């Protein structure tokens, strides 16, 4: 068997990646009135290896909703991406020659290449299956866009023996109907929806017109037939060397009907691009399928799967194809350090469109599309063709989004991190096969289903000293994502991020920090119980006031709270009161901070409510000093040149999943059998402890020394923050010293 596209011998035994994990969400799914909406919840446990009492559970909520009830009936125009070079391999050509010999001379059939294109049918099949999952409705009208009743079919039984089917005909031979009537009938309906010129060997003549009479199917039978037909068409296109075009068309169809709510606003730009994909009319001969091309596609082991089980399969597929956007971020290199792709501009938006951001997004999309298509092929179990056109088709769709007549709200900001649609953690049982430059740099998934993942608790850091109630560290920060310990502090009661601050350095050296309105608010009574704004407590400038605070995903966005220079962080260990009482805050010890964190997923479940994820985080997306720093490093006179954003020369295909830790070596993946049982919180030190000391000695100890500050730079290429020119404040914004909030 060969894995070469369009080889003479068709390689069988391919296995889509959705087969192993689909049993996770086994709770009953609901249909609410005329709209379909579901929320899936994954619980991920983070636990310190140095102290098992330092642990917390984080939740990821994936929300799917029906785009609109008539989305599946979207008008087919026949315009779009054209594919004219997909020819069958010899093994299929030999089968097809037997069909044509009945209608053409043997010599003509033997010397003819047989081409096929069912991309439009695959896109509509994806739309139909998504519609069924969200509404529970599927019938002949949906599959054919109400065109099957009036469709005239060309019959070949009475044709001239020397006649030959035109290149544009969709030929459904009788051999296929005898072999698999389910596939035959669904192909006919999908061909009707896509205005194909359908030809058959012989059918009944009704009222003087050749029309095909469909046998009866109930919805359960029809859904199974559609499921099997999808993989039949994928197999045909993959055997011709165009499997990547096929899986892209199918993915576009799935997301044309369902809306996966993004975990970041601009991350949904990929959804917009997928919806712009369209294809020309289908054609080709549909041969009897070669047995075993795909393995285990009938994961329900029944020909009439229950709607609840069937929806679970394809809900997962929809989520997984959206999560691949995160894994496919090509990244960017700043001072030899890889960061998530972040685009910045000081150009203002005009009529809801920022042309500079759109241009930068298109440049980054060139590399993103190549990686995304490669990962999509791996997920579906088809061969990625290095000479294929799928990435160019997707790139063209991005261009339509960026340059279309209608403004796109995802492109109207001054700072954006485009390649993060939804969180990918816990959605796959194996990430190592994917091509993911962003994961190799440590911004990828933080949990693998069915295994434990060991991560460094914090990014490379240096302990710089203690003074009074505090201990200080110098972090090679990069982003919040690089510090899994903060996931524990954010979700653990009693010693959270409110005891961590950045007061040793200015507060304006951040990109994409959260809750900016709090720090810039000047409302009457701000920070008091009588405030006219929503800020009833005073600003503390602690870490919890800089994060996004998203309720749909407890994990930090890969680009959340980005810094391109080192950061000094204070951890408050004690709370000293005026009367001499000292409360132990139970802040993580140095061993915990410098140690490791083990993560595991306890499963995915389907919820019946989305009330807990209605909050939308507030994120600063204006051009600030750190954005100026990024552009200076990108387009300045540095030796690293344009590879920071434009070339990506320093980011390449890698096999390891996470960046090596300077203290502990390569972070291993530890496999376990079956599900890990959830840990029980055993800490007995949650209650505040009080110790009586001499207030005078406490004051003297606090004032005796200043916390030492480690040097900010590790390279002569990295200037201090003072060397970076600040942008001029916008009209109505505070001046210097107020940060980018």
Curated annotation (Swiss-Prot):
UniProt keywords, alphabetically: Capsid protein, T=2 icosahedral capsid protein, Virion
Gene Ontology cellular component annotations, sorted alphabetically: T=2 icosahedral viral capsid
Superkingdom classification of source: Viruses
Localization per Swiss-Prot or TrEMBL: Virion
Residue ranges of the region described as Disordered: 716-741
Keyword Isomerase: no
Main localization of the protein described in the UniProt heading: virion
Chain segments annotated as coiled-coil in the UniProt record: none
Key word tRNA-binding present: no
Function of the molecule: Capsid protein self-assembles to form an icosahedral capsid with a T=2 symmetry, 35 nm in diameter, and consisting of 60 capsid proteins asymmetric dimers. The capsid encapsulates the genomic dsRNA and the polymerase and remains intact following cell entry to protect the dsRNA from degradation and to prevent unfavorable antiviral responses in the host cell during all the replication cycle of the virus. Nascent transcripts are transcribed within the structural confines of the virion and are extruded into the cytoplasm. Binds and removes 5' cap structures from cellular mRNA.
Similarity field: Belongs to the totivirus major capsid protein family.
Full protein name: Major capsid protein
Organism in which the protein naturally occurs: Leishmania RNA virus 1 - 1 (isolate Leishmania guyanensis)
């Amino acid at each position: 068997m060969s894995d070469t596209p369009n080889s003479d011998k068709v390689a069988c035994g391919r296995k889509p990646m959705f087969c192993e994990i689909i049993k996770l969400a086994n709770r009953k799914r609901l249909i609410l009135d005329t709209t379909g909406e579901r929320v899936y919840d994954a619980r991920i446990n983070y636990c310190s290896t140095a102290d098992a009492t330092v642990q917390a559970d984080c939740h990821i909520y994936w929300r799917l909703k029906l785009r609109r009830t008539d989305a599946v009936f979207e008008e087919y125009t026949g315009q779009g991406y054209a594919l004219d070079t997909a020819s069958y391999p010899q093994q299929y050509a030999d089968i097809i020659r037997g069909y044509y010999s009945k209608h053409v001379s043997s010599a003509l059939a033997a010397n003819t290449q047989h081409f096929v294109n069912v991309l439009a049918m695959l896109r509509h099949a994806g739309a139909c299956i998504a519609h069924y999952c969200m509404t529970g409705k599927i019938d002949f009208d949906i599959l054919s866009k109400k065109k099957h009743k009036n469709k005239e079919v060309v019959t070949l039984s009475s044709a001239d023996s020397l006649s030959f089917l035109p290149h544009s005909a969709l030929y459904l031979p009788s051999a296929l109907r005898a072999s698999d009537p389910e596939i035959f009938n669904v192909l006919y309906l999908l061909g009707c929806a896509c205005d194909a010129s359908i030809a058959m060997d012989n059918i009944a003549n009704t009222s003087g017109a050749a029309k095909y009479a469909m046998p009866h199917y109930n919805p359960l039978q029809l859904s199974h037939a559609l499921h099997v037909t999808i993989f039949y068409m994928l197999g045909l296109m993959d055997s011709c060397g165009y499997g990547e075009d096929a899986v892209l068309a199918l993915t576009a169809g799935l997301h044309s009907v369902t809306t996966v709510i993004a975990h970041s606003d601009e991350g949904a730009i990929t959804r917009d691009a997928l919806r712009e994909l369209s294809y020309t009319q289908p054609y080709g001969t549909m041969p009897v399928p070669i047995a075993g091309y795909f393995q285990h596609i009938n994961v329900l082991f029944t020909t009439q799967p229950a709607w609840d089980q069937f929806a679970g399969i394809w809900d997962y597929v929809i989520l997984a194809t959206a999560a691949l956007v995160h894994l496919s971020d090509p990244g960017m290199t700043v001072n030899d350090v890889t960061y998530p792709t972040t685009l910045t501009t000081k150009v203002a938006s005009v009529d809801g469109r920022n042309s500079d951001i759109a241009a930068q997004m298109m440049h980054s999309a060139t590399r993103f599309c190549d990686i995304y298509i490669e990962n999509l092929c791996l997920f579906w179990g088809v061969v990625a063709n290095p000479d294929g056109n799928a990435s160019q088709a997707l790139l063209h769709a991005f261009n339509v989004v960026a340059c279309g007549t209608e403004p796109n709200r995802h492109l109207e900001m001054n700072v954006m991190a485009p390649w993060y649609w939804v969180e990918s953690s816990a959605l796959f049982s194996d990430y190592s096969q994917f091509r993911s430059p962003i994961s190799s740099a440590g911004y990828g998934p933080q949990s693998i289903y069915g295994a434990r993942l060991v991560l460094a608790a914090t990014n490379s850091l240096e302990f710089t000293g203690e003074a009074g109630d505090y201990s200080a560290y110098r972090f090679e920060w990069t982003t919040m994502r690089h510090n899994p310990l903060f996931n524990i502090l954010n979700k653990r009661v009693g010693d959270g991020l409110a005891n961590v601050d950045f007061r040793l350095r200015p507060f304006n050296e951040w990109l994409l920090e959260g809750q900016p309105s709090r720090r810039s608010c000047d409302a009457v009574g701000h920070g008091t119980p009588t405030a006219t704004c929503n800020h009833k407590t005073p600003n503390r400038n602690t870490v919890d006031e800089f994060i996004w605070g998203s309720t749909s995903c407890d994990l930090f966005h890969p680009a959340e709270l980005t810094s391109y220079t080192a950061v000094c962080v204070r951890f408050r260990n004690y709370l000293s009161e005026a009367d001499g009482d000292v409360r132990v805050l139970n802040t993580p010890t140095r061993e915990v901070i410098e140690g490791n964190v083990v993560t595991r997923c306890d499963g995915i479940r389907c919820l019946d409510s989305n009330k807990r994820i209605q909050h939308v985080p507030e994120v600063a997306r204006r051009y600030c000093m750190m954005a100026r720093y990024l552009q200076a490093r990108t387009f300045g006179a540095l030796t690293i040149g344009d590879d920071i954003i434009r070339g990506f020369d320093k980011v390449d295909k890698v096999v390891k999943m996470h960046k090596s830790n300077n203290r502990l070596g390569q972070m291993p993946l530890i496999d376990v059998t079956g599900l890990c049982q959830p840990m029980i919180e055993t800490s007995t030190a949650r209650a505040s402890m009080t110790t009586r000391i001499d207030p005078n000695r406490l004051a003297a100890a606090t004032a005796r020394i200043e916390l030492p500050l480690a040097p900010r730079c590790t390279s002569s290429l990295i200037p201090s923050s003072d060397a970076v020119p600040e942008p001029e404040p916008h009209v109505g914004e505070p001046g210097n010293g107020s940060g980018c909030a």
